[in-house]
């Protein structure tokens, strides 16, 4: 209670005693919202999808509960009642800590895209099958549109052994437990909240339980809501805008009309304070709260100005003000301060910064910078050690992490792992080792070293200190030091042609003294009776030459043989003898043959090589393989046609970086033997087996289910979910053990490795697998093995069936005795088995057990009969192929791998908390821990510095329920920063929905010279769905700014998740120039989420490099090509616009599809079948969808290049040609042809009503002077609804085409915080990807330019090989000389006599631009320079001028662009384009300058105003007519069918 009082009093003091610079006036609110393009779905469906994400069993339990409700869900009177009824059902299945998280997910509607995908599939099927009913079923390839029809179809038996492949299934499908492997598939489309659904579900549930069908449920509604989904999880900024140059339109202000949120000033929620709730909780503070509310609603006209010296300690003073208060109220105060910082800055000056605070902040700032690389003003959030960057995090992804962590917390809690032990386990980083590729120890006598960097004489002049690794060199240069730090081992079949190119290349490394130690291992796995003599001969010959001369000569001997026999011939013994006698003339033919015989003096090393290769685990016989410092290189780069040399040097540069770190840290010194240091690293394994070591497509068994106790009830067991069935199996398993199987920690006897072996002991492979496992158990430590029979053998009924006997022995004998007994049986399977007496009692039940275990193997693991599988600590290794070996050494490798990855770390935590480890903590508990901790390890976990001080600048908030599992949350932020604006509302949300311990570390910038935060901010999120008094769902959350100062000029900007593309759909006022005193009323804007991006990174599988210029298309089954793009060289990045649904990603027809094929894709909700030319991608959430695509060159295409000169196919079909996006219509292909031959493409950008007015005038001026067809391209991101609504009318009036283009600024490219600088970036950074691939040339014209010539002259100009042409700045107006920055300092020396060019007008040859990767180069240079806030002041023109020596600029004649600021009046009459440049001397407003300088400007302006008035009058008249028509008979319901894809003018 006292804290609540402190909250109110504190805020009142802050608000009431803020000094004002003028008289207060009523401040009008500014509100903003974002809607989705799809409509609202019933909340009970969103709850269902939440449960499905948790467990399939929970989903079906919920469905069962819904069907048993007394009142059908969709027959409740209100949505509130529906929601509460659904929540009551959930409470019996979901723990109390998880309920707030569920409410939050439903409030954010983050699962509605998945439900929309269900609807999409249902509508496509229903419309194609002419079903009238909205509840229907798909039975195989047929539709059942009524219940009776479904019954009849199910009565028709499915042909024996036939598979129902006609139903396409998706990862989000709900498959009834136990029916996964049934042959007949039935998909029910229906509303689980309807009465009709109950009837269908009851029938299908019965059929599924009987094993007759695979039952899938997908959502469908008979009546869909018309209200759009209101979105949250984004921020809105109002930036204080400079008024140095007037940028406001002087046109009359429009009437705002009614808004959907009337009387916003009367809302109870003001600036984050819910006064209705506060008054209910604290009635005695009612008057103070009313005063506070009124004060918050009032705003000062101006923001108090601070003197320069007052900025200095602002961050520290903000920290002092916040740290004074402890408790959750601190977060409210921090949010209020951060969100309204410009208004509160003067108030903060009253807070004293103590020496203790200053010293503590300094110490903690250094600690965070040193250990976590976090420094103010950047902010960071840590949740259970997981790092989230304040700038890039989005709430949807954060919530997914919270859900994952919640599952782990509850699993730990349910296994009685609590308190500090649970916290320590949660904080473990179990990913660090997996990021390193595993290596094999190459200190092996099988490796025949060709050279020795440390001892060979030719390297004697090289420096011998490892410190030389730190010496700076030119990029890409290798460091020559006399240490064996780069060791390349080639495993080659020296007889085969495939080895020749790599051996020749390796010889050149030695000849040219590359700092690479080279070793050879001869692969003879292809040896047989016919060619064994050849393999013996090549080994003996190599050994002979090495002894007689040296290893370098032996290597040269090999290349000499290859030169003699040719490129394609397999080398034979005869060829070897011939070459040997040629090089050793004293050697007779007979003697040479003798030396090359088996068992000769020189026949050594073959067995060693075979053993080494066996430990490598390489699969492709005859194909050369390479190891760099023991790490295998991808096999596809070690081929004759691949750029092996480039791949080697790329790997060496990676290894160099690691070695430099080791030298810097003192881990590698001159006293160390380099090869020993390298081979003693943790990632070096005794053998390599990709089945064990690979980190791709890793699968874990879900063990954390609920075990069923009554094993006799087979019917119930069959209906258990997979996870519950696994838990039941685990509860009933016994294990084999060895003498050193257990270790004691605390009071618990533990085995840290649990292995399950699935096999059929009636097969040789099955017996071998279990034999190897038990051999390892006998010698291994802290390991146990269980055997699960996977057999359908007809002899299973025999009491001497080995599967039955081994299962019985494991269940009844002590672990060590069982191991010894079973090994005797396995190693002598044909001998008559004597059954021990202890097994007699259990043998009777083993036949039933074997049948149940076979069902488990098939249903849960998908194993065929007798198929083998190994599960180690819950991770699946297999299924193993029939010829795949998995021996004792592989089990030892599995143990080593598990220890390195995680079990050693878990062991250490348990030892440190031994007092908390009691007898109840057993190996099954450990296995459940692994099952919880390992699958979630996708991100690195960090530990906070241990030496932090917490007396003055840290806010500590304990968990609200100490007895329940809690999250550990730490936030590091500067209270006077943009990071604090975003993070603080998220911290408040976390405290509302999680039981968490939160530590807030305040580390402000120690000294400021300017206002640190120049914007107001609001974050949009609600922890739970809100309802109106009548029980209906509220409209949803929106951003509200109230009490803002009325005089400052503000510009609005949205901060949305990285994968959202939003468009303004309603905004009466200019959002770029908001001045409340001029508007005199509320400002409201609405946006739509137009697209959800599919992003990705694409790489060549062979070289690992991005396939620059590769073209991708995204579409659906019915429309395969809807959007297209190209792959950047920068990180192989691409983005494509999508929306909820199932999509197909393909390579574009033409060169891309001719040269490349998709080989692999990684990412959630993606599927790629081997050999398929397309990838299925599901967009089913609001979170980012980022995929990693690998492509491979097709056979015979290894030398082909995408960007070669014959790239004339770029204008082939794609979205940009297949959709007629021009105003005049016409066929798509015809439109494309016109563009290529006649149409002039003009690009421009604008933001704000003034610049849109200027843009319209630019367009008219250009059209009036240009005779050719014109197509305008506008950046849609910042255009107002008024402009986009007017465009079709203007296009009709002036007969031009147009298209609106969008591109989301990539998350990896340095972001600009000011809107204007972002717009400048779009002018130059994305020219290669912003436009369709068939657009060959484009002219950029500034919005404030006026064209006075036929622009075709510029369009047809020869650019002389340059990718673009700009006009240089004028030099003729002499009075501006002092402002010509390019004539002094950096620019003068950089340009080296070249002129500095202006970006108001330029022409781009896009074909040339893409061919030379100009976009990639510009982005690379931008990334490097933009980190410095003082670089690229004029981004759009500084960048191309900075790159003038790398990306050539053709200089246009001066008469192409004239602006009065820089050009003399004498040149005005000959100017072809006039630009209204800002004048730094006069600061003249744009409109004033336009009317003064350009005589025709007023005429153009008046002409456009007349057109706008005419259109407005026509639309008003049409609206009145429509209203009359509607009033005639509003009882008639009209149904309009709208195509699912209907592009507007020029946009998808």
Swiss-Prot record:
**Catalytic activity, EC:** 2.4.1.-
Enumerate the SUPFAM superfamilies for this protein: Nucleotide-diphospho-sugar transferases
Origin organism is Drosophila melanogaster (Fruit fly)
| A GO MF term | unfolded protein binding
Keyword set, alphabetical order: Endoplasmic reticulum, Glycoprotein, Glycosyltransferase, Signal, Transferase
Q: Which reaction does it catalyse?
A: N(4)-(alpha-D-Man-(1->2)-alpha-D-Man-(1->2)-alpha-D-Man-(1->3)-[alpha-D-Man-(1->2)-alpha-D-Man-(1->3)-[alpha-D-Man-(1->2)-alpha-D-Man-(1->6)]-alpha-D-Man-(1->6)]-beta-D-Man-(1->4)-beta-D-GlcNAc-(1->4)-beta-D-GlcNAc)-L-asparaginyl-[protein] (N-glucan mannose isomer 9A1,2,3B1,2,3) + UDP-alpha-D-glucose = N(4)-(alpha-D-Glc-(1->3)-alpha-D-Man-(1->2)-alpha-D-Man-(1->2)-alpha-D-Man-(1->3)-[alpha-D-Man-(1->2)-alpha-D-Man-(1->3)-[alpha-D-Man-(1->2)-alpha-D-Man-(1->6)]-alpha-D-Man-(1->6)]-beta-D-Man-(1->4)-beta-D-GlcNAc-(1->4)-beta-D-GlcNAc)-L-asparaginyl-[protein] + UDP + H(+)
- What does the record give as the function of this protein? Recognizes glycoproteins with minor folding defects. Reglucosylates single N-glycans near the misfolded part of the protein, thus providing quality control for protein folding in the endoplasmic reticulum. Reglucosylated proteins are recognized by calreticulin for recycling to the endoplasmic reticulum and refolding or degradation.
User: At which positions is motif Prevents secretion from ER?
Assistant: 1545-1548
Asked if the Swiss-Prot or TrEMBL record annotates the protein with the keyword Cell membrane, the reply is no
Signal peptide positions are 1-22
Reported cofactor(s): Ca(2+); Mn(2+)
**What would be one Gene Ontology cellular-component term for the protein?**
nuclear envelope
The record's section on InterPro entries has: Glyco_transf_24, Nucleotide-diphossugar_trans, UDP-g_GGtrans, UGGT_TRXL_1, UGGT_TRXL_2, UGGT_TRXL_3, UGGT_TRXL_4
Judged by the first EC level, this protein's enzyme class is transferase
Residues with an annotated glycan are 181, 266, 864
Oligomer and partners: Monomer. May interact with CG7484/Sep15.
Task: Name the chain's protein.
Answer: UDP-glucose:glycoprotein glucosyltransferase
Q: Does the keyword tRNA-binding apply?
A: no
Taxonomic placement: Eukaryota, Metazoa, Ecdysozoa, Arthropoda, Hexapoda
A GO BP term here is: protein glycosylation
- Compositional bias per record (Basic and acidic residues), positions renumbered to this chain: 243-253, 1512-1523
Q: Which family does it belong to?
A: Belongs to the glycosyltransferase 8 family.
Q: Which Pfam families match?
A: Glyco_transf_24, Thioredoxin_12, Thioredoxin_13, Thioredoxin_14, Thioredoxin_15, UDP-g_GGTase
Region annotation Glucosyltransferase: residue ranges? 1227-1548
């Amino acid at each position: 209670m006292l804290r609540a009082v402190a909250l109110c009093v504190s805020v009142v003091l802050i608000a009431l005693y803020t000094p004002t610079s003028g008289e207060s006036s009523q401040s009008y609110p500014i509100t903003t919202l974002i809607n989705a393009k799809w409509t609202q779905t019933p909340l009970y469906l969103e709850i269902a999808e939440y449960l499905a994400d948790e467990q399939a069993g929970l989903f079906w339990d919920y469905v069962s509960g819904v069907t048993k409700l007394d009142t059908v869900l969709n027959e409740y009177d209100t949505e509130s009642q529906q929601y509460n009824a659904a929540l009551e059902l959930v409470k019996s299945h979901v723990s109390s800590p998880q309920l707030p998280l569920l409410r939050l997910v439903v409030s954010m509607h983050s699962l509605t895209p998945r439900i929309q995908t269900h609807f999409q599939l249902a509508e496509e099927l229903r419309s194609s099958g002419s079903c009238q009913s909205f509840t229907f079923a798909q039975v195989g390839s047929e539709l059942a549109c009524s219940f009776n029809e479904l019954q009849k179809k199910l009565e028709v038996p499915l042909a024996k052994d036939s598979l129902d492949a006609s139903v396409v299934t998706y990862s989000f499908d709900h498959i009834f437990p136990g029916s996964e492997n049934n042959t007949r598939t039935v998909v029910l489309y229906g509303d689980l909240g309807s009465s009709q659904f109950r009837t269908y579900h009851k029938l299908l549930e019965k059929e599924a339980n009987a094993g007759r069908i695979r039952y899938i449920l997908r959502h469908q509604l008979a009546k869909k809501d018309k209200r759009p989904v209101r979105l949250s999880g984004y921020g809105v900024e109002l930036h204080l805008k400079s008024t140095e140059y007037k940028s406001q339109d002087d046109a009359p202000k429009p009437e705002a009309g009614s808004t959907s949120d009337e009387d916003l000033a009367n809302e109870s929620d003001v600036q984050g304070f819910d006064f209705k709730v506060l008054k209910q909780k604290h009635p005695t503070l009612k008057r103070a709260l009313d005063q506070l509310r009124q004060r918050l609603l009032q705003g000062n006209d101006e923001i108090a100005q601070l003197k320069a010296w007052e900025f200095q300690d602002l961050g520290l003073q903000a920290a002092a003000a916040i740290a004074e208060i402890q408790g959750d109220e601190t977060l409210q105060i921090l949010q209020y301060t951060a969100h309204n910082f410009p208004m509160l800055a003067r108030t903060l000056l009253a807070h004293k910064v103590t020496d203790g605070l200053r010293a503590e902040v300094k110490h903690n700032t250094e600690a965070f910078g040193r250990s976590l690389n976090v420094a103010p003003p950047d902010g960071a959030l840590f949740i259970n050690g997981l790092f989230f960057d304040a700038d890039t995090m989005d709430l949807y992804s954060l919530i997914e992490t919270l859900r994952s962590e919640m599952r782990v917390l509850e699993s730990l809690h349910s296994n009685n792992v609590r308190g500090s032990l649970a916290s320590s386990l949660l904080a473990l980083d179990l990913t660090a080792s997996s990021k390193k590729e595993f290596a094999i120890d190459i200190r092996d006598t099988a490796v025949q070293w060709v050279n020795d960097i440390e001892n060979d004489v030719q390297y004697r002049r090289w420096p011998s200190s490892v410190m030389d690794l730190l010496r700076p060199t030119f990029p890409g240069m290798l460091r020559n030091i006399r240490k064996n730090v780069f060791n390349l081992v080639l495993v080659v079949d020296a007889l085969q042609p495939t080895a020749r190119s790599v051996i020749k290349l390796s010889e050149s490394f030695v000849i040219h003294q590359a700092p690479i130690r080279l070793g050879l291992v001869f692969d003879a796995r292809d040896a047989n009776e016919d060619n064994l003599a050849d393999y013996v001969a090549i080994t003996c010959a190599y050994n002979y030459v090495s002894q007689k001369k040296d290893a370098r000569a032996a290597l040269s001997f090999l290349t000499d043989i290859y030169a003699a026999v040719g490129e394609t011939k397999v080398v034979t013994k005869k060829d070897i003898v011939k070459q040997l006698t040629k090089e050793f003339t004293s050697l007779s033919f007979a003697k040479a043959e003798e030396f090359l015989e088996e068992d000769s003096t020189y026949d050594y090393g073959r067995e060693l090589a075979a053993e080494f290769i066996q430990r490598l685990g390489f699969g492709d016989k005859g194909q050369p393989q390479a190891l760099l410092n023991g790490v295998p290189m991808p096999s596809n780069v070690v081929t004759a046609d691949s750029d092996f040399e480039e791949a080697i040097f790329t790997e060496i540069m990676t290894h160099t970086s690691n070695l430099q770190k080791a030298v810097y840290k003192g881990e590698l010194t001159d006293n160390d033997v380099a090869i020993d240091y390298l081979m003693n690293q943790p990632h070096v394994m005794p053998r390599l087996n990709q089945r064990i070591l690979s980190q791709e497509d890793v699968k874990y068994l879900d063990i954390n289910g609920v075990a069923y106790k009554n094993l006799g009830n087979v019917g119930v067991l069959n209906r258990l979910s997979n996870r519950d069935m696994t838990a039941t199996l685990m509860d009933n398993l016994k294990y084999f053990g060895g003498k050193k199987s257990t270790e004691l920690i605390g009071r618990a006897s533990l085995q840290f490795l649990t292995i399950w072996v699935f096999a059929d002991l009636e097969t040789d492979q099955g017996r071998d697998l279990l034999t190897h496992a038990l051999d390892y158990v006998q010698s291994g430590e802290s390991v146990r093995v269980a055997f699960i029979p996977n057999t359908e053998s007809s002899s299973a009924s025999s009491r001497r069936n080995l599967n039955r006997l081994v299962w019985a022995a494991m269940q009844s004998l002590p672990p060590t005795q069982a191991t010894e007994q079973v090994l005797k049986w396995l190693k002598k399977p044909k001998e008559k088995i004597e059954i021990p007496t202890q097994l007699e009692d259990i043998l009777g039940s083993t036949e039933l057990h074997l049948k149940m275990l076979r069902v488990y193997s098939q249903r849960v693991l998908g194993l065929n009969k007798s198929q083998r599988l190994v599960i180690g600590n819950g991770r699946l290794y297999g299924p193993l192929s029939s010829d795949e070996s998995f021996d004792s050494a592989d089990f030892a490798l599995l143990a080593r791998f598990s220890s390195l990855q995680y079990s050693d770390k878990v062991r250490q935590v348990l030892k440190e908390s031994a007092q908390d480890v009691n007898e109840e903590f057993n190996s099954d508990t450990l296995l459940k821990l692994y099952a919880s901790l390992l699958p979630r390890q996708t991100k690195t976990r960090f530990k906070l510095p241990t030496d932090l001080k917490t007396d003055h600048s840290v806010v500590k908030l304990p968990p609200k329920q100490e007895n329940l599992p809690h999250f550990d949350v730490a936030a590091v932020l500067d209270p006077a920063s943009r990071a604090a604006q975003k993070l603080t509302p998220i911290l408040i949300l976390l405290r509302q929905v999680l039981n968490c311990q939160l530590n807030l570390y305040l580390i402000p910038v120690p000294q400021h010279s300017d206002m640190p935060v120049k914007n107001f901010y609001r974050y949009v999120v609600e922890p739970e769905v809100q309802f109106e008094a009548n029980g209906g769902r509220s409209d949803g959350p929106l951003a509200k700014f109230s009490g803002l100062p009325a005089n400052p000029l503000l510009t609005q900007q949205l901060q949305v998740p990285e994968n959202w593309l939003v468009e303004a759909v309603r905004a009466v006022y200019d959002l770029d120039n908001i001045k409340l005193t001029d508007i005199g009323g509320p400002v409201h804007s609405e946006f739509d989420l137009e697209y959800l991006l599919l992003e990705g990174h694409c790489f060549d599988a062979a070289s690992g490099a991005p396939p620059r210029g590769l073209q991708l298309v995204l579409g659906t089954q019915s429309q395969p090509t809807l959007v297209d793009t190209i792959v950047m060289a920068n990180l192989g990045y691409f983005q494509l616009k999508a929306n909820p649904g199932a999509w197909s990603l393909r390579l574009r027809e033409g060169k891309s599809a001719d040269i490349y094929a998709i080989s692999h894709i990684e990412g959630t909700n993606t599927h790629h079948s081997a050999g398929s030319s397309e990838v299925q991608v599901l967009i089913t959430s609001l979170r980012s969808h980022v995929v990693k695509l690998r492509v491979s060159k097709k056979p015979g295409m290894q030398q082909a290049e995408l960007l070669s000169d014959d790239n004339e196919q770029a204008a082939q079909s794609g979205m940009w040609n297949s959709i007629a996006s021009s105003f005049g219509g016409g066929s798509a292909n015809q439109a494309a042809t016109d563009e290529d031959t006649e149409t002039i493409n003009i690009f421009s950008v604008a933001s704000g009503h003034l610049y849109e007015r200027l843009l319209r005038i630019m367009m008219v001026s250009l059209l009036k002077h240009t005779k050719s067809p014109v197509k305008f391209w506008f950046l849609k991101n910042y255009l107002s609804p008024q402009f986009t609504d007017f465009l079709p009318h203007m296009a009709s009036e002036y007969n031009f085409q147009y298209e609106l283009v969008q591109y989301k600024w990539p998350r990896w490219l340095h972001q600009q915080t000011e809107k204007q600088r972002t717009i400048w970036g779009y002018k130059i950074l994305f020219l290669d990807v912003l436009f369709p691939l068939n657009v060959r040339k484009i002219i950029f014209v500034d919005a404030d330019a006026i064209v006075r010539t036929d622009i075709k002259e510029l369009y047809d100009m020869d650019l002389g090989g340059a990718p673009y042409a700009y006009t240089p700045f004028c030099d003729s107006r002499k009075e501006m000389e002092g402002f010509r920055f390019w004539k002094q300092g950096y620019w003068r020396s950089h340009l080296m006599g070249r002129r500095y060019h202006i970006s108001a007008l330029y022409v781009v040859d896009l074909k040339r631009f893409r061919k030379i990767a100009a976009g990639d180069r510009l982005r690379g240079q931008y990334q490097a320079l933009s980190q410095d806030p003082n670089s690229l002041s004029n981004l759009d023109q500084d960048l191309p001028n900075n790159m003038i020596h790398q990306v050539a600029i053709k200089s246009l004649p001066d008469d192409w662009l004239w602006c009065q600021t820089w050009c003399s009046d004498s040149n005005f009459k000959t100017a072809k384009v006039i630009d209204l440049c800002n004048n730094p001397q006069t600061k003249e407003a744009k409109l004033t300058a336009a009317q003064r300088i350009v005589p025709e400007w007023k005429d153009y302006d008046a002409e456009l105003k007349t057109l706008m008035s005419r259109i407005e009058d026509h639309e008003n008249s049409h609206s009145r007519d429509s209203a009359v028509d509607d009033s005639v008979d509003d009882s008639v319901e009209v149904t309009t069918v709208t195509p699912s894809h209907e592009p507007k003018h020029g946009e998808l």
